Amino acid sequence: MAKEKTRVKRKERKNISSGVAHVNSTFNNTMITIADAQGNAISWSSAGLMGFKGSRKSTPFAAQMAAEDAGKKAMEHGMRTLEVEVCGPGSGRESALRALQSVGFTVTTIRDVTPIPHNGCRPPKRRRV
């Protein structure tokens, strides 16, 4: 007997005017998540998701592409204004922020929420190349 096909439910279009963009930029990758005011993720993207592999994921261009992708997905839900929270020491911080502005968002606030240790864990040893 033939198996009945399951229908894939189409993503419903939410009407959200403002939200928060979390830009997490590490030394190896850049991840952008756009959420509503309650913290529910609307769209997300990363440099790895955009097809970059290895050391190319950590470039500012990869972060720009990821931010544009996440921004376009969020704009489909009607989002127009953003608060941006930047976290991490990576190279894609500024380029991701500029890319979000170029997509068409009005950025109201920019917050740096990078955790700073008060002499916490021992850092990794220096690289000898």
UniProtKB/Swiss-Prot annotation:
Q: Which protein family is named in the record?
A: Belongs to the universal ribosomal protein uS11 family.
What is the recorded function of this protein according to its Swiss-Prot or TrEMBL entry?
A: Located on the platform of the 30S subunit, it bridges several disparate RNA helices of the 16S rRNA. Forms part of the Shine-Dalgarno cleft in the 70S ribosome.
* Any one GO CC term of the record: ribonucleoprotein complex
Record flagged with keyword RNA-binding: yes
Which UniProt keywords are given for this protein, alphabetically ordered? Ribonucleoprotein, Ribosomal protein, RNA-binding, rRNA-binding
Q: How does it assemble?
A: Part of the 30S ribosomal subunit. Interacts with proteins S7 and S18. Binds to IF-3.
Q: Which GO terms describe its biological process?
A: translation
Read off the InterPro entries from this record.
Ribosomal_uS11 (IPR001971), Ribosomal_uS11_bac-type (IPR019981), Ribosomal_uS11_CS (IPR018102), Ribosomal_uS11_sf (IPR036967)
- Gene giving rise to this polypeptide: rpsK
Q: Which domain of life is it from?
A: Bacteria
**GO molecular function list:** rRNA binding; structural constituent of ribosome
Name-wise, this protein is Small ribosomal subunit protein uS11
| Entries under Gene3D superfamilies matching the protein | Ribosomal protein S11 (3.30.420.80)
Species of origin: Parvibaculum lavamentivorans (strain DS-1 / DSM 13023 / NCIMB 13966)
